[in-house]
Amino acid sequence: MTKKTVRVRFAPSPTGPLHVGGVRTALFNYLFSKKNSGKFILRIEDTDSKRKVDGAEDYILKCLSWCGIDIDEGPYRQSERKSLYQKNISLLIKKGNAYFAFDTEEELKALRSESEKKGETFVYNWQNRKSLKNSLSMTAAEVEKSLQKKKSFVVRFKTPKNKIIKTRDIIRGSTSIDSNLLDDKILIKADGTPTYHFANVVDDKEMEITHVIRGEEWLPSLALHTMLYDAFKWAAPSFAHLPLCLLYTSDAADDFTS
């Protein structure tokens, strides 16, 4: 059997200067690719145009070059891959793993407030889907009418009910979580752009990424990403979530010792 070429990616958002933690993540990816005679890919995650900073991408490229981190492929830009996300979200909806949700932000805010008064947390999932405004509770004719009228909507992932989601991380080991505790995450926002979670999984599949090496702030997202791979019936890459770089300060040290 032919051994699969190692392919890793560094995927910063052009929202400002590249910080030390980002450079460290890039370095881990770069060194892992070189150790395994693989490819280091740069992907610019720029779907959030409101947060995009002019010149940030050039700054990222200069920083990587200054650090001696050579790019084998890229930079790829998510803003130039919208048709790919539309194709895959249509596939996911057709498979029954995602759905249109027409609830307004005001309506959801009211539901959250109502839950808070009861000492509860509002979670949009299998427990209340049928009572909310979405393509799972509406008739096909109602959904079509809403789409034709161009009513604002998002596309949500249909989190499976009563399922133990098992995940595997190279650093953290195996974990599991009850799907009933999870919400139906938004995959496509009201403006038509993909969320980080959806674009991330689609891009990693299309770019044939074998190892996802990223900061541990993304560890809570691993269950969702695992479910997305399962829904598409795609083989998931190996995951490694790196401990964060924390700033040492005298105040922090005093708090710790006290």
Where are these regions (language model features)?
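Short intrinsically disordered, low-complexity segments
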Residues: 30, 197, 256-257
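Single conserved hydrophobic/aromatic residue that forms the stacking wall/gate
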Residues: 248-258
